[in-house]
Amino acid sequence: YLTDETTEKFPETEISGIDKEAAIEQVKSILDEIGVEVSKPRVYSLTYEKLEENTDYSQTDPNGNAPHQWTEEDAAYAIVFKGTIDTLPITEVGYRSGPAAGERIVGIVGKQGLIAFHALNIYELETENELSDEILTTQTVLENIQQKFRNIMITDKVEIEKINLEYVPVLKNVEKGEYELKPMFVCMARQNIEHSTDKEDNGLIGDSSIFPIIFDAQTGMEIQIGGTY
């Protein structure tokens, strides 16, 4: 999955020898052809140098195979779109609420053209309903987050980096495979965690974790990640 951490691992904006705008248009043309409305994409530059840097060649996959040996020909753009309905994006975060999941649209374009295209969990709108309540303010969402952590003993600070209003799919009918797209505030939180080392100097090493916190935009109720809504 491509997450906020991917930006930190692949910070470059361009790849020599690959036209970024042409790469974006190549993926966008597929989405236009199948009738998927999308927002402006995020583009990650998967350069050869960073692919090498972020690959642990000492690790093997479950079948015992060693990682791919990268070359400069492997450099590519990872182009990530969010599906939208009336310009409001459908979430792509990796939450789970029963069998519902966020929408994921990714195209990989290299020097030889399109390498891979994934469009997962694409939702087709059948009917529209009026909202039963007004959308909450972001201030209310922040207060809900403060309340969430108020009675939890944590030693490492949690920072909210993003608050986005997005549609989140919620399972409505299992047999018919029907979902309801509900407006939610998707909050991306970062927690920097320090671990003690085994060294005699009792040193500390840092680690960072990014995770979503999701609230119903009308009721303020939190979706429990991994459970039912």
Where do the model's predicted regions map?
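Accessory, solvent-exposed terminal regions and/or long lumenal/extracellular loops of proteins
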Residues: 178-182, 192-196
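A short, surface-exposed beta-strand/turn
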Residues: 1, 90-119, 197-229
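Charged, low-complexity helical/coil segments in non-catalytic cytosolic or luminal regions
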Residues: 97-181
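Preferential activation on post-signal-peptide N-terminal prodomains/segments
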Residues: 1-96
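Conserved histidines in hydrophobic membrane contexts and catalytic metal-binding motifs
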Residues: 27, 107, 185-191, 220
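Generic short beta-strand segments
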Residues: 82-88, 166, 188-194
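A general secondary-structure signal for short beta-strands and their flanking turns/coil
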Residues: 74-78, 100-102, 180-184, 208
